[in-house]
């Protein structure tokens, strides 16, 4: 009797395994398709510049405000380049961070510290650390290229009155500060609305919100506020953008290590 029961059990197990594998594959494919559609919102922008305000908000509600200038450059076939330069307050004036995002290779980042008058390369294993006391990490300041993650589609749900795709993405970089990220992308424009970041112990570390989107040149979407709430320490950081301009004629020369020192 036992022999007769083995074969149907094996068949049922194989059917279940096949169904599970197919389901996972379809989920991964759908998650990737959604991520690619979202990424296309930035195709062809060439370059952009903006003025930024960074607010550091303590658990008690105390606020420290910093002013920056930010510019970025589209690099066909690779990740984008960006340069952020602090203008105030005095203790961070002239500090600059240069980022070269790459589609599959580790990103390159350099930090210019005017007090030391030198450019410091940020090692890949240190990019999960906080950026100048904010709740943003060096990793957060680099562009999130599609190719750097594995994806799974989770579900569709309503968020802030918008129907959103909810996907999971897992960083492929072994030095990432995150084990996974849950991303809400609206189904109308495929804009990222919210990200839950999970730390290396798989606890919910931070919640990132993308607010006040505007479209430029009828083609390029820009959030005018990005909020990073730390769920573990109660602190928050807010980036606000103004004077956003596209197609300024920026070139690679504007994003070199020498440009870090010139940007003071």
What do these predicted ranges mean?
Residues 29, 147-156:
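Long, terminal "pre-/pro-" and other extracytoplasmic accessory regions
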Residues 78, 160-163:
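Short acidic/glycine-enriched loop/turn segments that link adjacent beta-strands
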Residues 36, 98, 108, 112, ...:
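Gly/Pro-enriched, hydrophobic low-complexity segments
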Residues 71-73, 152-158, 212-213:
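Short amphipathic beta-strand and strand-loop transition segments with alternating hydrophobic
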Residues 22-30:
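Bacterial Sec-dependent signal peptides at the C-terminal "C-region" and cleavage site
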Residues 12-23:
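Bacterial N-terminal signal peptides
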Residues 2-13:
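Bacterial N-terminal signal peptides that target proteins for export
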Residues 30-115:
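N-terminal mature ectodomain segment of secretory-pathway/periplasmic proteins
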């Amino acid at each position: 009797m036992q022999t007769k029961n083995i074969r149907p059990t094996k068949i049922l197990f194989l059917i279940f395994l096949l169904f599970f594998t197919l389901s996972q594959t379809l989920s991964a494919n759908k998650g990737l398709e959604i991520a690619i559609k979202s990424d296309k919102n930035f195709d062809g922008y060439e370059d952009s510049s903006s003025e930024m305000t960074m607010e550091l908000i303590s658990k008690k509600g105390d606020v420290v405000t910093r002013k920056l200038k930010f510019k970025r450059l589209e690099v066909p076939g690779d990740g984008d380049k960006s340069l952020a330069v602090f203008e105030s307050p005095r203790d961070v004036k002239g500090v600059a961070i240069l980022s070269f995002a790459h589609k599959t290779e580790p990103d390159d980042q350099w930090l210019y510290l005017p007090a030391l008058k030198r450019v410091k390369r940020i090692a890949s294993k240190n990019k999960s650390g906080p950026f100048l006391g904010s709740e943003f990490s060096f990793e957060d300041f680099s562009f999130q290229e599609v190719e750097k993650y594995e994806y799974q589609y989770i579900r569709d749900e309503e968020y802030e009155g918008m129907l959103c795709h909810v996907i999971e993405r897992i960083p492929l970089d072994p030095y990432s500060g995150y084990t996974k990220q849950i991303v809400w992308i609206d189904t109308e424009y495929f804009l990222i609305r919210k990200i839950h970041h999970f730390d290396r112990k798989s606890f919910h570390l931070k919640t990132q919100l993308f607010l006040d989107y505007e479209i430029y040149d009828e083609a390029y979407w820009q959030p005018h506020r990005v909020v990073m709430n730390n769920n573990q320490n109660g602190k928050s950081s807010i980036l606000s953008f103004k004077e956003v301009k596209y197609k300024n004629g920026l070139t690679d020369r504007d994003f070199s290590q020498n440009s870090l020192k010139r940007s003071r």
